[in-house]
Amino acid sequence: MIPAPIFSGTFFIVLGISFLAAVSVVLWIVALVLFPPVRRSFRAYRRRSTAIFAALCVTSSFVVAMVAIGLQAEANIRKEEAAKHPALVKSERLLGIDMPPGTRLSLSTAGDMNSIEKAEFPHAVDVYGIAAVALTVGTEFDDEAPRNDRDLATLTALTLTTTGPRTIDGWTCGSKAPLKIVLRNDARTRTLWSCHLADGNRVAGGVVPAGSRVMRSTTTYGDGMRDNDYWEIRVAEDDVFELSSLPLRHAELRLDRERTVLAFDYATLARAASVGNIAYPAGTEVTFGVRGLREDYPGAWRFRTPGRQHAVDKNTGPIADGASVVQAPSGKVYAIFPGRTD
C-alpha cells in the first residue's frame, strides 16, 4: 500500500485562502465601525462593496467551519474527560469499598462507575482493613491457580497509598511507597502482593532492613517445575541482611509460606567473613538453595570469590583466585571448583 497524506497540498492552499478571507472580513468590519470615510466609501459603492464582502464571507466560511469543528471536538473531549474524572457528591460503595463524598475517581469508560482505575479519598478510608488515602486498580496473574497457558487466571489488584505502617499477612509494610494487595474468592479474601517493608520484620533470625521489598513470587521453570517458594524479599540497596553470621548485600531471598529461607542468589558479602576454616573476602558471591546446587549439595552454600581475590583456608592456605567453594553452614567443604564455573 502506498502511503498517502491525510491532507493534500490543495487542502492547505484552500485553507490559507479561506483564512486570508476571514482576516479581511474582520478587518473590513473593524474599519467600517471605526472609520467614517470607510463607511462613506462603502455606501458610495454599495453594490460592488456588498458583492466583494459577500464573496469574502463565502470564502472564509471554510476556515470558520474548520474552527467550529475544532472547538466542538475540543468541547467533546473536555466533556468526556470530565465524565472520566468525576467526584462523588454522596457516599457510594464501589469495588466493595465505602467511598465518601469528595472522592475523586478516574474511570476507563466515561460514566461507568465499575471501570475505576484510580480513586483519591478526601481522608483515610478503610480498604479491606487497610487505611488508605488513594488506590489504583490493576490485575495480577494468579500463580496459585492451576497453570493453563491458554487462559491465565487473573486477580484484581489494588495499589494503596497508606497513612502509616500496616501489618498485612504478618509483614509490616511502610508508607513511603504504595503497597499492593490482591482480592481472591470474589473479593472475600485479600492478601498482600507486594510492599516495601518498615522496621521490625525478621527472617531466619535476622532483621530485614527497612525499605526492602517483599512480594508474592513462586519460581516456575521452563520445564513446568515449580518451587515451593511463596515470598521473595529483595534486600534494600546498600543495606546488609545478616543470615547465619553472613553479612549479605543485594540478596534476593526466596521464602516459603512459613518464611523459611529456601534459596537466595545475587548476594555478596558486605565484609570479610569466615565459615569453618575458610575466610572469604568482601565482595564474594554467595548462593544457596538454587536449582542444581540443592540437588547435588542439599543445604550447602556456594561461595565464588571476586576475580583476583581468593579465599584462605587456615589449614592449607590460599584457594585459587575466583574459585567456587561449596560448603555447609557447619563448615564442611563439599567441593572446590577452579575458575568461575557455574
Where are these regions (language model features)?
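Membrane-embedded alpha-helical segments of integral membrane proteins
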Residues: 1-40
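Short low-polarity hydrophobic stretches
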Residues: 23-30, 56-62, 190, 262
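Internal/C-terminal transmembrane anchor helices
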Residues: 45-73
